[in-house]
């Protein structure tokens, strides 16, 4: 059951591959360079599963109302693999009845203009570009293989491809970040003028590299001071609409 609309459901499609593993991440993901041979068989299986979900939903009299392709990193797929997957979705579902169709395009080191065009062409109505921070030093420290400038370039490519609903994620409390650094990231995101900005606090699970290697975390007081900077979002006209809570 999705929301209060009767006989509807939401579809989540997970892509468990990443160009590198972020130090804070505890999600299931495979290294793209090491496990590239697994990607195409996985996409083939996903397409068969999409077809089966459609068949079962029709039997149950259910209508699809939202789609979310997340990960991992969905844009670790090639442009052709994205066409295959999103084409299968489009062939099986009436996208005119879908209220929101999101694809995470979070990593600029594997998101290019062609992939952004494919995502738009095949019906996505919302994408998420997730810098987490605009500090090159912090990006390197958490295992990202790209720069802050790469994020800006990716965002520009997304607008050129016609994407009109873009979310950007930031994380307060990343190792090596400071209150001033987080404020800079907030201001940079606001300057880009995306439709949504999502701020998370760093939440660590046992499977994250930060925990396993016992890396130093930011003090609670520093994280609290970072969150106080979120008044900048309200001043820029952003209004909260989403609440997510998670226990460590």
Where are the regions a protein language model picked out?
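Short, flexible loop/turn elements at secondary-structure junctions
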Residues: 17, 73, 107, 245-247
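C-terminal accessory regions of radical SAM enzymes
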Residues: 233-248
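Canonical Radical SAM [4Fe-4S] cluster-binding loop centered on the CxxxCxxC motif
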Residues: 8-43
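A generic secondary-structure signal marking the coil-to-beta-strand transition
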Residues: 9-11, 65, 193, 237
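Short loop/turn segments at secondary-structure transitions that flank enzyme active sites
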Residues: 19, 203-205, 247
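N-terminal [4Fe-4S]-dependent radical SAM core
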Residues: 1-11, 60
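Conserved non-cysteine loop/helix-boundary elements of the Radical SAM core domain that shape
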Residues: 29-228
